[in-house]
Amino acid sequence: MDDKVSEKESSPKQTEEDSEGKMAHVQPASYVNKKKYVFGKTLGAGTFGVVRQAKNTETGEDVAVKILIKKALKGNKVQLEALYDELDILQRLHHPNIVAFKDWFESKDKFYIITQLAKGGELFDRILKKGKFTEEDAVRILVEILSAVKYMHSQNIVHRDLKPENLLYIDKSDESPLVVADFGIAKRLKSDEELLYKPAGSLGYVAPEVLTQDGHGKPCDIWSIGVITYTLLCGYSAFRAERVQDFLDECTTGEYPVKFHRPYWDSVSNKAKQFILKALNLDPSKRPTAAELLEDPWIICTELKTHNLLPGLKEGLDARQKFRNSVERVRLNMKIQKLRDLYLEQTESDSDFDEGSQANGSVPPLKATDTSQLSKKLSEEEQSKLKSELTSKAFAQLVNTVLAEKEKFLNINRVCSSDSDLPGSDIKSLDEAKEKPEGKDTKTEE
């Protein structure tokens, strides 16, 4: 695609500079586009806004809408730059395995980014519903991920946050393409060799060089693919550290950054393990590119193992998903309430946040109207106390669920970490491989 973007595509950055002056007067010209969309349920929430499902009434297409509050972004140059980068990157990428950009517009107080809606669910959720999962199935998935990353890297774009939660199916059919989503911290490099130095990513999937701030580029995405592949084949994550230094210690202790615990890895081929170790090379300059991994012996092998890995996968993946879902239900409602408290007037009725803001199975977040009717009778201190009590009760109803799921999840971790490694001969076919010394066990994610 031509490096030059259209006037409309480049205008968010320009219009934002004038937005403060407009906020007290009229809506920006692009706001008329909002009339095309009917908003539905809330899909997620963050520090600066929410993501909601919507329908384009002109085309009938379901879409995802990221809504960002300008007040929250005001004065935050880093986040504003990330917003402009995301818009620029989304408009440059056109690939069947990358979520498609649809539109953008703004109101006097919000930005709206419209993208393709992936209705088929997350990668690991789909696997849990299968009756069988083999290495052949894993390879098909990785070909889609690698194809997307190869294309991104050819455009000098680094995703920097590849993880299972950002790998989504477009629809529920068996033929649905898998797409890479969430380019919120992606960066467009000025050259093939440019390095970035500010840390970004998700602990457990982020490459070591990102955290040590030694400079990172395209190879950091390859590391993330290695971690995803590891979990794809065993059901638990390669690392369980919850702090940066613990993670760095975990992946640098021993000759290899990960171990293949038995019995979980007994039925996985050596070629698959070699693929993982190549992607998880601690030296980013020695990691293969996405194009090279597409030609890896494991990926192009015509006689892959057909052993059903699903029974072993389900225990780990199911505990992982239930724990994460419980935590996310709490986080979603707390984030939405915080956004209301910080940036919306108490009496303001804001359809962008009220309708459909409840996470499935969770306690409804407080609405501004819950206390507005009492405002004349209660002092500010009393109102604040009431809101705090209501929030605490809502949170308390969820905390037991989270703790229960966490205990199940940690039980899986303990089993994995207590198992011995596979015999050293199991990985000796690697170039320059030696018998792996005993070191710190690698365990599951937080």
Curated annotation (Swiss-Prot):
User: Residues where Phosphotyrosine occurs?
Assistant: 343
* SUPFAM superfamilies xrefs: Protein kinase-like (PK-like)
Q: Where is the active site?
A: 161
EC numbers on record: 2.7.11.17
Keyword ATP-binding found: yes
**Keyword Electron transport attributed:** no
Boundaries of every Protein kinase domain copy = 37-299
Q: What catalytic activity is recorded? A: L-seryl-[protein] + ATP = O-phospho-L-seryl-[protein] + ADP + H(+); L-threonyl-[protein] + ATP = O-phospho-L-threonyl-[protein] + ADP + H(+)
Q: What else is known?
A: Present with 1520 molecules/cell in log phase SD medium.
Q: What does this protein do?
A: Important in cellular regulation.
The protein here is known as Calcium/calmodulin-dependent protein kinase I
Naturally occurring in which organism (per UniProt): Saccharomyces cerevisiae (strain ATCC 204508 / S288c) (Baker's yeast)
Q: What is the lineage of its organism?
A: Eukaryota, Fungi, Dikarya, Ascomycota, Saccharomycotina
